Each structure stands twice: as structure tokens, then as C-alpha cells.
Design a protein with these regions (language model features):
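Membrane-proximal, non-transmembrane alpha-helical segments
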Residues: 428-481
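TM-lumen/periplasm interface segments of multi-pass membrane proteins
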Residues: 100-185, 452-459
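Single conserved hydrophobic/aromatic residue that forms the stacking wall/gate
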Residues: 1-9, 13
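Short, Lys/Arg-enriched, Gly/Pro-containing loop segments at transmembrane-helix junctions
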Residues: 48-58, 561-572
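Helix-boundary/low-complexity linker signature
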Residues: 11, 577-579
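Hydrophobic transmembrane helix bundles of membrane-integrated enzymes that assemble
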Residues: 16-29, 33-49, 58, 65-104, ...
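Cytosolic nucleotide-binding catalytic cores of signal-transduction proteins
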Residues: 582
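Membrane-proximal stem/loop segments at transmembrane-domain junctions that anchor or position
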Residues: 118-156, 338-451
Length: 582
């Protein structure tokens, strides 16, 4: 079926110009009017919000000269909660517009993974790519796609669960119906960035009472991280990684809000549902994110218990809602994982063995015999799964290879192999650590340029340049850091002294750590040496957020200690003149 924009000959009713076009224009006009009215109300409330007494920047009434210069004057500026949120919001909007609105902006390049996502969310190549197939693969940024059906209501529910990108994609389709044209990943990027910004601003608002002035630098650091070009490229693409930062940030924001709100609040019903939606976004971003399901269930169960009502009937209803949310998230996550098994499982297993384990084995012949692989397949060692079929002894999808390889070599077979060969496993783990030092620029480029591997980016790379300072270069360093952090969090959780909010935040830290740690071995053990840096994306994202959180906690603890020491020194200095006079 030829696909052009949103029109197809297979769906004549849906493209009838006498029905759809006028309806689209009518809805578009109504949306514009509603947007103007809503915008006016929001702007008015924002101005009132920022003009109230508590939200102003309290400037001390003194001149710069009288206070010892401009620096001393600026130190006396008191930043409020609403002012902090407003500054972080302005910085986020400025970063997004600066990097995505120019004609030359960053985007993702198809490395072969787009097809899997396009099939799941019902997207197809637009006419220019159909006319020239060379532009479909590692050519450059492609932002315009076509689709047959405007909406898929079943895929938005547990009836037909699919990748979580389906949710923002439906909003993009609706906008496309109103404006005409193709499905645009640039519009998709702005929608995803809006969700990330909303989560970040909610975090800044909720954490201000705990962190005070530290909230602003922490919020700006996270903004520079998630809105840098290395992360923006994923939003403007059809990679599975697109929804991971969205789901993770929404999960963190909802968890912090639930942890800090009064226990048993009526609003906890709504926020439990929002938390379930957030973890669903995270666990179904791509198939391998199913490993985050245990952490998601822990969060849902803990807050179901923590916020349970005291009355009997509301308690039963709240408990049933928590159980239902856990069941739906689990069902959708496992459903998405099962869907993906038939799509890429064979290629993944191939690369794990021939492009990974056998390449580092001291005796490849013995390793092949141990894994039950025929000796005639030895020439395939070192080949990834995307060469032409003529390059292999047996084609990747052939029945012969199914019988000789796939029928008895599975992911669990490879796990057992590495457990029997700890030296090889350590080699692969160290490889993963080396790949996690820098954020990769593979499979991303600017819209006006042809793709070249690891092309340098030139707009917003502050976080990319800084993160190599605290990234480990060996596996044992990660074991030491994460082991120490895990023991510290468990101590906080099981000690009686800390407040319950502190215990809940420590549990969140452990859950984010779990999500990242579970992705660490998959990058190399589960995919060999193929796209290691891309496969480490989730781990690096979790690691970066954990580093910022740990840094804020450390500074927060050092500030009271420093003040206590200064007060002790001051008191000691005051006592000395008194002793001399006596």
C-alpha cells in the first residue's frame, strides 16, 4: 500500500476531504481559541504567582559599595521556592529553543533499530525515503514519517500493550491531523522535553524545603544534563532509548512527591496512578527495560502501604487499586517483552556469542564445543548480525542455523558460560566500564549534514565534558562505589532514627541504582561488542542522576558540619579574652 502523509488508498473513508479536512480545521480553530484563552489565564496566574510577597527575590536594601562590593551584595540575595522554580524553567525553555528550533539541530540516525519501533507504533517511511532506500540507513537525520491509521486506541491500553513511545506519538498524530504534513520527530521531541521539564520542575519545587539554596544549582545541573545535545538527539529519534529519561524522571518526581506529602493524603490516590503511568513508561520504553519491573513494583507496593487510609472501606479500595496498578504494569511490561522476542532475540544471541564471548575466549575451539556450536562455524567469529547472508556459513535467519545454533544456545546458556569463566566475564565488565566514561555521539548528527560516526557536537556539551571526571574506568570501582552507597541506603532504611521521608528517599535511590545496575551487564554480555556505548545509555543516565543526588546530599551534610566547626572556633575565641582578664 502506498503511503503518503496520513492518506492511504486502503482507508478512503478516513481521508475523505469532505469529512476529515473540515473537521480537522474546526478542531484546529477550537484548539487555537482554547490555547489563547488558557494561555491568558496561565500567564495571569503566573504573574500573580511570581508577584506575591513570598515569591520575590528579597534584595537587601544596601548599596554594593557599602556591603563590600558586588559579590558580597549578591551573596545576600535570598532565593525563594517559586523564584527557584521560575529560574530553572526559564533555563530549560531557553536550552530547548536554542538547540531544537534552528534549521541545523541535532537528531538521531537510524542504525537499523528504527524499524522495530516503527512497526510497533505504526509508522512508515515517507515518500523521499521510499524513492531512495539509501537514505533509510545511516544516511542522516530523518524527521518526517508516514502512517496509515491516525489513532490506535487499543495500543494505549493493556489490550494490546506496546512500546511507551506510542503515547506521545498519538499526540503528534493529532497535531498532524490539524496542521497537515507528516509525523514529525521534532514535534515529538518537544512533547517529550515538556514531560521531562515538568518532572524536573516538580522535583525542584518539592525538594526546596529540604535543600534550600542548593536546589537551584542542583536543578540547573540536571537541566544541563538532560537537555544537552547528547540527550536531545534521542528525543528526536525513534530509538527505544527515547522514552527512558522521560519515564525515569517522571518516576523520580512522583516518588519524591509521594514521599514528602502528608501520609494518607487524599491526593495520594491521584499520585499513585501517576506513579503507575510513569513506571509503565519506563518499563516499556524498550524490551530490555523489563528488568526494571522489580524496582517499579517495589515503589508501587511501598507507597500503597505507606499512604493507606485509616478507615476500613477506603483502605480496601486503596489496596485494591494498588494491586490493580501492579498487575497492569506487570502485564504490559511482560507483553512488550514477549512481542520483542521474535524481532531481535536471534540477532542479540548471535552477537553475544560470535561478536562477544568467542572473540575473547582463550581457546575458541573449546568454547564452541562447550556451547555446542559446530566447528565449521568458526569463520563467523568476529562478525556481527547485520552482514549480508553470503558472509556467513549459515544465514542468520536460516533453518540450518536454527537447528545448529539457536535451538540449544540461549541467553541463559551464555550466562552459565560466563559464570564458568569468570575471567572472560571480568573482561567484558571492564569493557563496559570503559564504554561508560563518555557519552557517545554515535548515531546522531545535525539535520543539515550527512552522518559520520562520532561527529563532534558544538552546542550544549557541558555535561558531556564534565561526566568523565567521576566516571569509573574499571569494573571494581563501580562495585566499590555502588556497594558503599547501597550499604549506606540500607542502613538509613533499617535504622529507627531517620524520619520516614528519609527512608523513602533512600529507597528511591536504591531503586534507581537497581535499574542502572541491571542494564550494566546487558551492554556486553547480552550484545557482545555491538554498540556498547549505546547499550550503556540507561546505566549512564542512572549513574549521572545518582552522582548529582549523592553530591547534593554530601554538600548538604558538610554545610552544617562546617557551621558547627565555625561556631566552636568562635566560642573558643570568645572564651580566651575572658580567661586572660580573669
Amino acid at each position: 500500500v502506498a503511503v503518503t502523509g496520513v492518506q492511504t488508498c486502503a482507508l478512503p473513508i478516513c481521508i475523505d476531504l469532505l469529512t476529515v479536512k473540515p473537521l480537522a480545521f474546526l478542531l484546529g480553530g477550537l484548539m487555537v481559541l482554547v490555547s489563547f484563552a488558557s494561555g491568558a489565564v496561565v500567564l495571569r496566574r503566573l504573574m500573580v504567582w511570581l508577584s506575591v510577597k513570598d515569591a520575590k527575590l528579597a534584595l537587601p536594601p544596601c548599596s554594593a559599595g557599602a556591603s563590600g562590593g558586588l559579590l558580597a551584595y549578591l551573596r545576600k540575595i535570598r532565593m525563594t521556592q517559586k523564584g527557584t522554580v521560575a529560574i530553572v524553567a526559564l533555563v530549560c525553555v531557553a536550552l530547548c529553543c536554542w538547540q531544537l528550533l534552528p534549521a541545523e539541530h541535532i537528531g538521531g540516525v537510524n542504525n537499523g533499530d528504527f524499524g522495530r519501533m516503527m512497526e510497533q507504533i505504526d509508522l512508515y517511511w515517507a515518500q523521499p525515503q521510499l524513492d531512495d532506500e539509501s537514505t533509510q540507513f545511516e544516511w542522516g537525520v530523518v524527521e518526517d514519517f508516514s502512517y496509515r491509521e491516525p489513532f490506535h486506541p487499543a495500543r494505549l491500553t493493556s489490550i494490546d500493550p506496546t512500546y511507551s513511545l506510542i503515547f506521545p506519538s498519538m499526540l503528534v498524530r493529532f497535531i498532524t491531523l490539524l496542521t497537515g504534513g507528516h509525523y514529525s520527530t521534532q514535534v515529538q521531541a518537544f512533547i517529550l522535553l515538556s514531560l521531562v521539564m515538568a518532572a524536573l520542575l516538580l522535583l525542584v519545587h518539592d525538594l526546596y524545603p529540604l535543600l534550600g539554596k542548593l536546589t537551584l544549582p542542583a536543578g540547573l545541573i540536571v537541566a544541563c544534563m538532560l537537555l544537552g545535545e547528547n540527550y536531545l538527539a534521542w528525543y528526536n529519534s525513534l530509538f527505544g532509548e527515547t522514552m527512558i529519561p522521560v519515564g525515569l524522571m517522571l518516576t523520580i518526581a512522583c516518588t519524591v512527591h509521594l514521599a514528602l506529602m502528608p501520609r494518607g493524603s487524599r491526593k495520594s490516590w491521584l499520585w499513585m496512578i501517576l506513579l503507575a503511568i510513569s513506571v509503565r513508561f519506563l518499563c516499556t520504553a524498550k524490551a530490555q527495560m523489563a528488568l526494571a519491573l522489580p524496582a517499579a513494583l517495589v515503589l508501587l507496593i511501598v507507597f500503597t502501604v505507606y499512604h493507606h487510609p485509616q478507615a476500613k472501606k477506603p483502605l480496601i479500595a486503596f489496596s485494591l487499586m494498588g494491586a490493580l496498578l501492579c498487575g497492569l504494569v506487570s502485564y504490559d511490561t511482560l507483553g512488550v517483552y514477549r512481542k520483542n522476542q521474535g524481532v531481535s532475540e536471534k540477532q542479540t544471541i548471535w552477537q553475544s556469542v560470535f561478536y562477544g564471548a568467542l572473540m575473547i575466549a582463550d581457546d575458541p575451539d573449546a568454547a564452541m564445543e562447550e556451547l555446542g556450536i559446530p566447528a565449521e562455524m568458526k569463520p563467523d567469529i568476529g562478525k556481527h548480525a547485520y552482514y549480508p547472508n553470503s558472509e556467513y556459513v549459515y544465514p542468520i535467519e536460516s533453518d540450518e542455523l536454527q537447528e545448529k545454533f539457536y535451538d540449544h544456545v540461549t541467553t541463559m546458556t551464555l550466562v552459565r558460560y560466563y559464570l564458568r569463566h569468570p575471567k572472560d566475564m571480568l573482561t567484558m565488565m571492564n569493557r563496559a566500564a570503559q564504554e561508560s566514561v563518555t557519552l557517545s555521539t554515535s548515531f546522531m548528527t545535525y539535520t543539515d549534514a550527512r552522518y559520520s560516526d562520532n561527529r563532534p557536537l558544538h552546542r550544549m556539551n557541558l555535561w558531556c565534558n564534565l561526566r568523565s571526571i567521576f566516571a569509573a574506568r574499571a569494573f571494581w570501582v563501580y562495585v566499590l562505589l555502588y556497594g558503599t552507597a547501597g550499604v549506606f541506603c540500607l542502613t538509613l532504611i533499617f535504622r529507627k532514627k531517620p524520619q520516614k521521608q528519609t527512608k523513602l528517599l533512600a529507597m528511591l535511590f536504591l531503586c534507581v541504582m537497581f535499574v542502572g545496575v541491571m542494564q550494566y551487564p546487558l551492554s556486553v554480555i547480552g550484545n557482545g561488542f555491538a554498540d556498547n556505548n549505546k547499550q550503556m545509555y540507561t546505566f549512564m543516565l542512572c549513574h549521572d542522576l545518582l552522582v548529582v543526588a549523592a553530591g547534593v546530599v554530601l554538600v548538604r551534610r558538610l554545610i552544617p558540619a562546617r557551621r558547627t566547626a565555625e561556631n566552636a572556633i568562635r566560642e573558643e575565641a570568645d572564651h580566651e579574652p575572658q580567661e586572660e582578664s580573669a
